Amino acid sequence: MNAPDLTRPPLTIRRISLDTGRENVAVISRRSRALRPEVFRGFSRVELRINSKVLLATLMITDDDAMIGPDEVGLSEPAFRRFNEPVGSAVSVTPARSPASLDAVRAKIQGHTLSAAEITAIVDDLAHFRYSDMEIAAFLISAARFTTTDELLALVGAMASVGTKLTWDTPIVVDKHCIGGIPGNRTTMIVVPIVAAHGLMIPKTSSRAITSPAGTADTMELLARVDLDVEQMKQVVHACGGCLVWGGHVNLSPADDILISVERPLSLDTPEQMVASIMSKKLAAGSTRLLIDFPVGPSAKVTNANEAMRLRKLFEFVGDHFGISVEVVTTDGRQPIGRGIGPVLEARDVMAVLGNEPGAPADLREKSLRLAAHLLEYDPKLRGGTGYARAKELLDSGAALKKMQQIIDAQGPSPCPAELGSYAADVLAAADGVVNGIDCLRINRLARSAGAPVAKGAGIDLFKKIGDRVEKGEPLYRVYASDRSEFDLALAAAQAESGFAINHHTPADVDLVS
């Protein structure tokens, strides 16, 4: 039986300045001349249609005639962009029935294992915005309880197949990924030009910050455009051997971005979901060789060697299945890498390393060289064990800086150059001693409270690291902000709890990359 019409005659589209995240929302007046409450009662979603174009949206009712007139349907910003029809267009609105794939979600909630076909149907509906946030959360929570290896493989394959899938005309396409959680750590922007300068292809797509003070895309955006489409990205890669672009604009594994938007507020980050997220994007990007950086530390995502081992085996298992050679390295995750935390400060550190400046952060330089060495040794013409020497040669000679400038020129000038925030103050040591620990989560939160990454010039500039001796009253770091209220908030929080542990015990040395 067909669903009855919700509107007669059609309503006209009105754009509402309402950011509803990734969810499509349609708003209708309670006094709509076309609205029949007895028809839509029991339906929380509606289908909007113009000819063959269809949009599913969550239905909301308003009593505010100034917001929506009786002959209009209002579309939130995400819904308006996706429907892509002019304001004033006539649109039919009918009740939308739940996607059939929700039956599989209910089965998963009840403890059943899903087939590949069921998972493919769920991912397809997710990617086409047929699920509400509540329905997405139900799927994520049910999958967090248990996910079999067969389900994981099906999920990775389905997520990679929806959206853009890149192919390249070379058998070796290298990539790197860090699972995150460490402030600074902007190694990708150094590794990519080193590897591309050597001659290996490295088409790098990166994310914007979700819970951190800066993502690679946020930082690179200060130097060049990152919102390239697929064809523009390919042109840059063919010209330069590599790129540094925002993955969200290339539409790789779009279902993953939707899942992440719901995972974060729920603090869901299971190993299986992490692997599905990363590997689906790498599969869609056409990568054949993948290096994954696991920072290990007390406030990192991976806190010990046992966790790292289990996660490594999961990545390698999925990589083997899809023909991607995966190498995992564990790195020092006890503290930030580099000095700057926040887009402007991190871009400064990157260019200082590439430019071989005397004051460039030594830890950022060394970690980048060692990660690049692993990738360079995928080149069959390079003898095993010589990757580090080659990476250092490319950095020291200026070849990596030259390649970075070529990539910047090819991607186009930055649309948003920025300066450091105009408000600044130092956070001081509360006692004499040795820096014995730095809480990465705390430092991340402080930098975000200062306004990063939205305010590009906000963040934290570190003066001390683990093992450094300090005196009471000596600066540990400087807080920058572009807004007075954010500055006051961040500074007060930092003075109350700096994130630094200072005592008289000298911490043990930990290898930067192992």
From Swiss-Prot:
Catalytic reaction annotation: thymidine + phosphate = 2-deoxy-alpha-D-ribose 1-phosphate + thymine
Coiled-coil boundaries: none
InterPro entries, A to Z: Glycosyl_Trfase_fam3 (IPR000312), Glycosyl_Trfase_fam3_N_dom (IPR017459), Glycosyl_Trfase_fam3_N_dom_sf (IPR036320), Nuc_phospho_transferase (IPR035902), PYNP-like_C_sf (IPR036566), PYNP_C (IPR013102), Pyrmidine_PPase_CS (IPR017872), Thym_Pase_Put (IPR028579)
GO molecular function: 1,4-alpha-oligoglucan phosphorylase activity; thymidine phosphorylase activity
Entry GO CC: cytosol
SUPFAM superfamilies for this protein: Nucleoside phosphorylase/phosphoribosyltransferase catalytic domain, Nucleoside phosphorylase/phosphoribosyltransferase N-terminal domain, Pyrimidine nucleoside phosphorylase C-terminal domain
Domain of life from the UniProt record: Bacteria
E.C. number(s) listed in UniProt: 2.4.2.4
Database matches in Pfam families: Glycos_trans_3N, Glycos_transf_3, PYNP_C
GO biological process: pyrimidine nucleobase metabolic process; pyrimidine nucleoside metabolic process
Alphabetical UniProt keywords: Glycosyltransferase, Transferase
Family note: Belongs to the thymidine/pyrimidine-nucleoside phosphorylase family. Type 2 subfamily.
Name of the molecule in the record: Putative thymidine phosphorylase
Organism: Rhodopseudomonas palustris (strain ATCC BAA-98 / CGA009)
Organism taxonomic ancestry: Bacteria, Pseudomonadati, Pseudomonadota, Alphaproteobacteria, Hyphomicrobiales
